[in-house]
Amino acid sequence: MFLELINFLAQFDAGFNVLNYLTVRAILAMLSALFFSLMLGRVFINQLQQYQIGQIIRTDGPKSHLIKAGTPTMGGILILFTFMISVLIWGDWSNIYLWIVIVTSIIFGTIGFTDDYIKIKHKSSNGLSFSIKFLTQSLGAIVISTWIVLISQDSIQTQLLIPFFKDTMLPLGIIGFLILSYFVIVGSSNAVNLTDGLDGLAIMPVILISGALAIFAYLSGHYNFSSYLNIPFMPGTGELFVICAALIGAGLGFLWFNTYPAEIFMGDVGSLFLGAILAVITILIRQEILLFIMGSVFVAETLSVIIQVSYYKRYKKRIFLMAPLHHHFEKKGMSEPKIIVRFWMVTLILVLVSLASIKIR
């Protein structure tokens, strides 16, 4: 939004051109989102408390969680709002990737908001039915995946990049690309949702992964860097650098209030939209495999639920004391802060491993 104003002012003073630089806009986007989050966070929490919009705790969960009952939830609205405002201020409105991310955020944020609203209205831990939730997520994923295919200008954009190997890309074709994108979007959205069970557990991995994706987006969108590093050049993806920076700022601002002991939870409105936009950004820069690596904490949480449910249905026994995985460790007596920090550490290590793929190939 400011780019037009900046270009106009640059006609009178060339110094304004510095605000056109991608790195400058990314820094300003991150700082703006962080500032908005910190300024609005306390007011937002007070409003949630006033209207008694609090977390509903499962009675069959860890007993230590009962004290969290009534903690303000739907904090994902704060993340979504500050993220989108920052992106719209500092982003390039002529870049189609910006609008793909914005629309994805709105679609999955709306699904999550509806789910949270039903839980609060009925004072139950059950929101949307599984079938409706899965159907709406699927429709959203199909729409976004199809949109990405329609704007693809090069066959590279429908190939799967294999990290750590030089010039290795797997042709998917349009159908293969749509199928992969569908599973990445729906899977990532639900994985972050399942992980969001402890204070700050989900948001820090999202921040760390966003940081890595910002680097990959910047390199992929820069012809000289991508050529030197032997990374496929994808024009326009550099704008995702600004978007990732805004997400980092919004995430850090939320973590200020969400860190243990949390003053607010993100709810499904936050987790579903965060997982979805991580997936979409990854798809746009063709780094799906690296998302799987960096997001292994999310993957492990999801697999623990799938394994637990499948095994119980077949043998009427449980493999884990409780699923998702973080609850299993709680049941074993590990403190919540220790679980959270260790999951953060695992994510940080895997993010660094993924970043190593820039040079190791």
From Swiss-Prot:
The chain crosses the membrane at residues 26-46, 70-90, 93-113, 131-151, 168-188, 200-220, 237-257, 264-284, 289-309, 338-358. Keywords: Cell cycle, Cell division, Cell inner membrane, Cell membrane, Cell shape, Cell wall biogenesis/degradation, Magnesium, Membrane, Metal-binding, Peptidoglycan synthesis, Transferase, Transmembrane, Transmembrane helix. GO terms for cellular component: plasma membrane. It is a multi-pass membrane protein. It is found in: Cell inner membrane. It is an enzyme of class 2 (transferase). Its EC number is 2.7.8.13. InterPro entries: Glycosyl_transferase_4, PNAcMuramoyl-5peptid_Trfase, PNAcMuramoyl-5peptid_Trfase_CS. The keyword Cell membrane applies. It comes from the Bacteria. Its cofactor is Mg(2+). Its main location: membrane. GO terms for molecular function: metal ion binding; phospho-N-acetylmuramoyl-pentapeptide-transferase activity; UDP-N-acetylmuramoyl-L-alanyl-D-glutamyl-meso-2,6-diaminopimelyl-D-alanyl-D-alanine:undecaprenyl-phosphate transferase activity. The keyword Nucleotidyltransferase does not apply. GO terms for biological process: cell division; cell wall organization; peptidoglycan biosynthetic process; regulation of cell shape. It catalyses: UDP-N-acetyl-alpha-D-muramoyl-L-alanyl-gamma-D-glutamyl-meso-2,6-diaminopimeloyl-D-alanyl-D-alanine + di-trans,octa-cis-undecaprenyl phosphate = di-trans,octa-cis-undecaprenyl diphospho-N-acetyl-alpha-D-muramoyl-L-alanyl-D-glutamyl-meso-2,6-diaminopimeloyl-D-alanyl-D-alanine + UMP. Disulfide bonds: none annotated. HAMAP family: MraY. Catalyzes the initial step of the lipid cycle reactions in the biosynthesis of the cell wall peptidoglycan: transfers peptidoglycan precursor phospho-MurNAc-pentapeptide from UDP-MurNAc-pentapeptide onto the lipid carrier undecaprenyl phosphate, yielding undecaprenyl-pyrophosphoryl-MurNAc-pentapeptide, known as lipid I. Belongs to the glycosyltransferase 4 family. MraY subfamily. This is Phospho-N-acetylmuramoyl-pentapeptide-transferase.
